[in-house]
């Protein structure tokens, strides 16, 4: 074992840090570059704060790409356009006229 200068801080000891800086590459060689690279790249563990994704906001300028709601066509109502009351009356009249029981 090499003799280490006791006046040096532990993180400055020779061999404590790799000669090359860490990079963003995820190849096998770079994953085993140092302990920090191994935990981040090899194991995928990161203890940093997660950044929140910002929602897209509409531009504040007068240029809007959508038509206003008033110009859009009204959606078609499904089913009976007359309404539920008249359809109930039809059902009641059919049950009274059909004595199939």
From Swiss-Prot:
Chain spans, region Transactivation: 1-48
Q: Where is this site: Essential for Tat translocation through the endosomal membrane?
A: 11
Q: Which residues of this UniProt protein bind Zn(2+) 2?
A: 25, 27, 30
For the modification Asymmetric dimethylarginine, which residues carry it? Answer: 52-53
Q: Where is this motif: Nuclear localization signal, RNA-binding (TAR), and protein transduction?
A: 49-57
Locate the cross-link: Glycyl lysine isopeptide (Lys-Gly) (interchain with G-Cter in ubiquitin): 71
> One Gene Ontology cellular component annotation?
host cell cytoplasm
Q: What are the alphabetically sorted keywords of the record?
A: Acetylation, Activator, AIDS, Apoptosis, Host cytoplasm, Host nucleus, Host-virus interaction, Inhibition of host innate immune response by virus, Inhibition of host interferon signaling pathway by virus, Interferon antiviral system evasion, Isopeptide bond, Metal-binding, Methylation, Modulation of host chromatin by virus, Modulation of host PP1 activity by virus, Phosphoprotein, RNA-binding, Secreted, Transcription, Transcription regulation, Ubl conjugation, Viral immunoevasion, Zinc
- Biased composition (Basic and acidic residues) is annotated at 79-101
According to the record, the residues making up region (Interaction with human CREBBP) are 1-24
Notes concerning its domains: The cell attachment site mediates the interaction with ITGAV/ITGB3 and ITGA5/ITGB1 integrins, leading to vascular cell migration and invasion. This interaction also provides endothelial cells with the adhesion signal they require to grow in response to mitogens. The Cys-rich region may bind 2 zinc ions. This region is involved in binding to KAT5.
**Family of the protein in this entry:** Belongs to the lentiviruses Tat family.
Q: Which HAMAP family match?
A: HIV_TAT (MF_04079)
Described purpose of this protein according to its UniProt entry: Transcriptional activator that increases RNA Pol II processivity, thereby increasing the level of full-length viral transcripts. Recognizes a hairpin structure at the 5'-LTR of the nascent viral mRNAs referred to as the transactivation responsive RNA element (TAR) and recruits the cyclin T1-CDK9 complex (P-TEFb complex) that will in turn hyperphosphorylate the RNA polymerase II to allow efficient elongation. The CDK9 component of P-TEFb and other Tat-activated kinases hyperphosphorylate the C-terminus of RNA Pol II that becomes stabilized and much more processive.
Q: What else is known?
A: HIV-1 lineages are divided in three main groups, M (for Major), O (for Outlier), and N (for New, or Non-M, Non-O). The vast majority of strains found worldwide belong to the group M. Group O seems to be endemic to and largely confined to Cameroon and neighboring countries in West Central Africa, where these viruses represent a small minority of HIV-1 strains. The group N is represented by a limited number of isolates from Cameroonian persons. The group M is further subdivided in 9 clades or subtypes (A to D, F to H, J and K).
Q: What is this protein called?
A: Protein Tat
Q: Which organism is it from?
A: Human immunodeficiency virus type 1 group M subtype F2 (isolate MP257) (HIV-1)
Give the source lineage, highest ranks first.
Answer: Viruses, Riboviria, Pararnavirae, Artverviricota, Revtraviricetes
Query: Per UniProt, what is the name of the gene that codes for the protein in this document?
Result: tat
């Amino acid at each position: 074992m090499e003799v280490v200068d006791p006046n040096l801080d532990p993180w400055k000891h020779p061999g404590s840090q790799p000669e090359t800086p860490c990079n963003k590459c995820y190849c096998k060689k770079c994953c085993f570059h140092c302990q920090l690279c191994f935990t981040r790249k090899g194991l995928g563990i990161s203890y940093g704060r997660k950044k929140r994704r910002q929602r897209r906001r509409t531009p504040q300028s007068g240029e809007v790409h959508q038509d206003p709601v008033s110009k859009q066509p009204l959606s078609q109502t499904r089913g009976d356009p007359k309404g539920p009351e008249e359809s109930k009356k039809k059902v009641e009249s059919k049950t009274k006229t059909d004595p199939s029981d």
